[in-house]
Amino acid sequence: MAQLQIGVCTWSLHIPDLGQTLATIKDQLGLGVIHLGFFDDGYKEPNKIIDLVKASGLKVSATCLGFAGEDYTTIQDIARTGGYLPDDVFEARYEKTVAVADITPKLGTDILTVHIGFVPEDHKDPKYAVMVDRARRIADALGERGVKLVMETGQESPENLIAFMDAVGRPNVAVNFDPANMILYGVGEPVEAVSLLRDRIAHVHMKDATWSAKPREQWGEEVVLGTGEADIPRIVSKLRAQGYTGTLAIEREAGNQRVADIAEAIKLLKSLLG
């Protein structure tokens, strides 16, 4: 069986100071791997971030991008404002993406994850071709830096995501598999998606959720890992059977006891990995 590493997303702790976040991850949670988020303007001081991470001794499994102006209030809001789809902010978001891609190898990883934005299910929609072109441009820029564009699951069905990746046609495009997002957005069963996405999975989030009464219209609910409907034990088992050897990065984006919830997730994953 493949050996997997347990990590955590830095933003999940909800601690504003990166140094304090890293210390909590290492000393309180006892983890050695992080998925490092770039959601504000911190990327403009790359040496400060690189020095903090190196001093911590933590390994970076991937970097992660988020953008000012993304609105997650409703599914409809994020469909309108998310990722690389909005025309008025694309160039600014492209520039930030390239800047973080410059930092990524210096942190010891070649994986940059991002929600690229809603890709239309209808491939004849004019926005579909726009998203293909933009993804190619981004993938090419990342490729020049030895970095993979790793798209997070959730906003598209697995089938549409695969078709989109094939249309983009770049070897450095892969998937960050987030089982909870499949449920939160209402786009598909996570266990089935693992099998469909298979070799395209380059990084994994460990997050859980329960289904909405109105999938694709209203958000599902994020819950503590192992208490939702994602079937985390089966997902971990399938990933191992398929030969995935990367990081299982715990992500917790709800609740007021993040560190305690992450500690519960660590306990669950350790029991599953044996």
Regions found by a protein language model. Give the residues of each.
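Active-site acidic/histidine proton-transfer and metal-coordination neighborhood
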Residues: 20, 72-174, 233
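A short, acidic, amphipathic alpha-helical segment used as a generic capping/interface helix at domain edges
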Residues: 228-241
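Residues at the N-termini of beta-strands
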Residues: 33, 111, 203, 246-247
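Acidic-and-aromatic substrate-binding clefts and catalytic sites of carbohydrate-active enzymes
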Residues: 11-18, 36-48, 68-71, 119-123, ...
